[in-house]
């Protein structure tokens, strides 16, 4: 398969991969794709294939020189043609700071040793690529990601329910649909529907005077920065946002459709986030 064929297949598989990661994280359809990988610590499809191709390269160069597969490889290396597999290997190696001349060193390694080296280098490469992509998206460019070695703790901790982790993911990426400024082009107005005095942003929700009157001390005890803090801070701020969203639903519901007194927050186990 040549480069163009691989690119086409990668694009198809990547669409499926994105759908799976969006289902896991509860991500909004407009969430930048790189955030799916930066938050989960996963490699995208092109880099997964890069790792596997280099592992197969090690397998080939470790074979006896009289084996047919090794002979084909040597022929490609000596007289490469456009679209040959060897060209993709060269490109992969170049991206992680290696060359074909490192064959002898690679042959001396066990599969696990080489795999660990390749995965480490490819993860660093992917991290750089994702962070570069992230820098072009205003909503998420200031979120710091230093490694792809593991997912963000909130996605795997047993201290936090899946609904909470999905809420947190969308708050971190400014894709929680209830806040108008997250998607200004899709909303007729952008003012806070509760106080009608400030832009309807996630940050303002914690400072809204109506929210403060209704929820009181709970709101003042958390900071917006908690969304990007440790797990305990994230749990605290998510509880407040959960209550804010319930309050908004209660106060903004059409008259006669509320389940309790105006402004009351009705606990609902089926929709509880924490």
Short names for language-model regions:
Residues 23, 27, 43, 52, ...:
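Generic recognition of well-structured, leucine-rich alpha-helical segments
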Residues 135-274:
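Family-specific functional microsites
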Residues 28-35, 101-103, 222, 229-236:
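Short, surface-exposed acidic
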Residues 53-166, 238:
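Flexible, low-complexity interdomain linkers flanking nucleic-acid-processing modules
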């Amino acid at each position: 398969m040549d480069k163009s064929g691989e690119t086409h297949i990668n694009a198809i598989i990547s669409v499926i991969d994105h759908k799976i990661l969006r289902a896991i994280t509860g991500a909004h359809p407009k969430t930048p794709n790189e955030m799916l990988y930066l938050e989960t610590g996963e490699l995208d499809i092109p880099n997964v294939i890069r790792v596997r191709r280099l592992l197969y390269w090690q397998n080939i160069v470790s074979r006896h020189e009289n084996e047919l597969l090794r002979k084909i490889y040597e022929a490609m290396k000596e007289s490469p043609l456009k679209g040959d597999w060897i060209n993709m290997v060269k490109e992969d190696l170049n991206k992680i700071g290696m060359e074909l001349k490192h064959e002898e060193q690679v042959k001396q390694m066990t599969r696990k040793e080489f795999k660990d080296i390749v995965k480490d280098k490819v993860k660093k490469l992917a991290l750089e690529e994702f962070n570069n992509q992230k820098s072009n998206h205003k909503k998420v460019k200031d979120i710091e990601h230093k490694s792809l070695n593991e997912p963000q703790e909130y996605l795997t901790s047993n201290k936090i329910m899946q609904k909470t982790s999905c809420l947190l993911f969308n708050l971190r990426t400014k894709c929680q649909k209830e806040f108008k400024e997250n998607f200004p082009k899709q909303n007729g107005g952008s003012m806070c529907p509760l106080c009608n005095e400030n832009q309807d942003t996630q940050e303002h929700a914690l400072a809204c005077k109506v929210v403060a009157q209704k929820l009181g001390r709970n709101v003042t005890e958390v900071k917006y920065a908690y969304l990007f803090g440790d797990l305990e801070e994230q749990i605290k701020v998510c509880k407040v946002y959960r209550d804010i969203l319930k309050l908004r639903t209660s106060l903004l519901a059409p008259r006669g459709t509320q389940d309790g007194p105006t402004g009351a927050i009705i606990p609902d186990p089926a929709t509880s986030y924490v």
